[in-house]
């Protein structure tokens, strides 16, 4: 779940 939530972590 990195590509889709890349904006969530910063």
Curated annotation (Swiss-Prot):
This is MP2 protein. Salivary glands.
């Amino acid at each position: 779940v990195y590509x889709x939530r890349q904006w969530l972590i910063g």
